[in-house]
Amino acid sequence: MTRHGKNCTAGAVYTYHEKRKDTAASGYGTQSVRLGKDAIKDFDCCSLSLQPCRDPVLTEDGYLYEKEAILQYILHQKTEIAKKMKAYEKQKQALKSEGQLESKSEERERAEKFKQRENNIVSKPINPFTSGKSKDEGNQNGSTSSSSTDTSSGESSSSSALPSFWIPSLTPEAKPTLLKKPSKTVSCPMSGRPLKMSDLITVRFTPLDPSLDRVALLTRQDRYVCAVTKDTLGNSVPCAVLRPSGVVVTMECVEKLIKKDMVDPITGDKLKEKDIIPIQRGGTGFAGSGVDLKAKEARPVMQA
């Protein structure tokens, strides 16, 4: 509420507009923005580079990638996994050697204590004139003194073990964060599921005008059509890829034509349900397109 007096208003109420303005300027609080059409990728763009694909490939979850970009991503992830695994093995060896040193030091301490105990044994002469009562009293006194000694030693050891930040020798030390064993599988950057190079499906888009080259095709808004019905493809048209041929068809064509015979119209191969892969589209910018159009950024919160 620091900017309330600087705003062009004489009202005593902290308005919603001022609150949003202060939230954006202060750097505190969760900030949310409603995304528009320009913030949504097209259906034929790579999910990594957000650029139209030259050599598109599709995952089994329906995410479209540029082949070069996704191969570079897989290679980078494998190198990162190798680095993490190397660091984990190094930590494992360090913990193992530390455990061996601790066990050796404990054995050495036990041996030293045993030697001291053996050297401190002194046989006292038995006095024949002492009565059993005095022996019992002596035993009781000895047990009491030993118990008090044990209690005092236990208290002193527990008090010495307490961490004290004002004493340099008793200052608690922060233990290093232990690394977890990294997973060796490369995951998809969009879905998070395991990703393999052999699972990528080559996609063949049917251009709207075959006479145009790629540069001229990219300047148009309507670039590709369905391989069967020749309907224009876009973010507002649900479409799918047929695994055997890799062609892109509309979901309307799949429901009305292809699912009747379950045959690929291009190659003539038999199709299964898993061979029809819907493409994950970016949406149209409208709320009813099925895409979350609200971006949120969680920032520190000022609490009273």
From Swiss-Prot:
Localization in the cell: Cytoplasm; Nucleus
Disulfide bonds: none
Keyword Signal: no
Reactions that this protein is recorded to catalyse: S-ubiquitinyl-[E2 ubiquitin-conjugating enzyme]-L-cysteine + [acceptor protein]-L-lysine = [E2 ubiquitin-conjugating enzyme]-L-cysteine + N(6)-ubiquitinyl-[acceptor protein]-L-lysine
Compositionally biased tracts (Low complexity): 143-160
Entry GO MF terms: ubiquitin protein ligase activity
Top-rank lineage group of the source organism: Eukaryota
EC number(s) given by UniProt: 2.3.2.27
Biased composition, class Basic and acidic residues, residue ranges: 99-118
Alphabetized CDD domains for the sequence: RING-Ubox1_NOSIP, RING-Ubox2_NOSIP
Keyword Transferase part of the UniProt annotation: yes
Annotated region described as Disordered, given as residue ranges: 94-165
Chief subcellular location: cytoplasm
Motif (Nuclear localization signal): 78-101
GO CC annotations on file: cytoplasm; nucleus
Keywords of this entry: Cytoplasm, Developmental protein, Nucleus, Transferase, Ubl conjugation pathway
Pfam families: zf-NOSIP
Known role: E3 ubiquitin-protein ligase that is essential for proper development of the forebrain, the eye, and the face. Negatively regulates nitric oxide production by inducing nitric oxide synthase translocation to actin cytoskeleton and inhibiting its enzymatic activity.
Family according to the record: Belongs to the NOSIP family.
Stated name of the protein: Nitric oxide synthase-interacting protein
Record organism: Danio rerio
